């Protein structure tokens, strides 16, 4: 599943080419993905100008000029591919489920073989009350994510720290890949009880502080590298993510330790 760096990579690619443009048509090639598409989604997106493209956790928030937001989650295998015009978009592939044509001729195609993605239309500003976003924790690259806030979230957790960091209610956007890398760099065992990590706050270089520092560092490096391509992730221009070449632990079982 695309994690925060991969979704941010997609966001940046879409924003570069689509932000400020107007949608001329939308073609839905099935009735939904993980859930049915919103009623009249084609009509509601057509002739709308894209004001901005934001991200919350692993969700894309495409802001439209009618005060609505097109919410997109890529699921396990969802991806957007951009084409400059019809001459580049030669034929519709088997799993191309949503085709967006822009007034300037550009085409954005959403492809999702496993169909675990999600699309919805919501009122801009009301996303915090949406059933998929209401309980999501703070953004790990924000100032709100610090040793104190992390400690407070972990203090009563009896689960392993790895499990806790995967909980989207504690911190947004992390998945198995990046939690493994973060804990390795922070020198914290993934099996350590989350509450014991919280209890170290106040000591010199607490475990929470190390986790926060390494979270921000790993995510920043991963975004700069275009995310991680394990199987089928690609940016909107087809480029692969190269942070996978920097893995110290994920997918390296049985190989020499790099720590």
Predicted segment positions?
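Gly/Gly-Pro- and Ser/Thr-rich, intrinsically disordered tail segments characteristic of DNA damage-repair
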Residues: 1-119, 127
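Alpha-helical structural motif
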Residues: 3-6, 10, 19, 37, ...
């Amino acid at each position: 599943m695309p994690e925060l760096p991969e979704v941010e990579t997609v966001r940046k690619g879409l924003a570069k080419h689509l932000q400020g443009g107007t949608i001329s048509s939308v073609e839905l090639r099935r009735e939904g993905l993980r859930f049915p598409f919103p009623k009249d989604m084609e009509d509601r997106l057509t002739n709308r100008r894209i004001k901005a493209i934001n991200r919350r956790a692993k969700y894309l928030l495409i802001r439209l000029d009618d005060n609505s937001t097109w919410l997109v989650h890529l699921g396990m295998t969802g991806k957007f591919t951009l084409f400059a015009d019809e001459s580049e978009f030669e034929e519709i592939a088997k799993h191309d489920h949503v085709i967006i044509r822009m007034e300037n001729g550009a085409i954005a195609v959403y492809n999702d073989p496993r169909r675990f993605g999600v699309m919805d239309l919501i009122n801009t500003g009301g996303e915090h009350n949406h059933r998929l976003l209401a309980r999501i924790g703070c953004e790990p690259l924000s100032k709100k994510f610090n040793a104190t806030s992390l400690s407070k979230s972990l203090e009563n957790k009896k689960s392993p720290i790895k499990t806790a960091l995967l909980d989207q209610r504690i911190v947004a956007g992390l998945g198995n890949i990046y939690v493994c890398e973060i804990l390795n760099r922070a020198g914290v065992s993934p099996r350590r009880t989350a509450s014991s990590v919280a209890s170290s706050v106040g000591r010199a270089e607490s475990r929470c502080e190390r986790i926060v520092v390494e979270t921000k560092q790993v995510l920043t490096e991963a975004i700069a590298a275009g995310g991680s391509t394990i199987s089928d992730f690609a940016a909107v221009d087809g480029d692969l993510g190269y942070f996978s070449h920097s893995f110290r632990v994920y997918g390296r079982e049985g190989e020499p330790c790099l720590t």
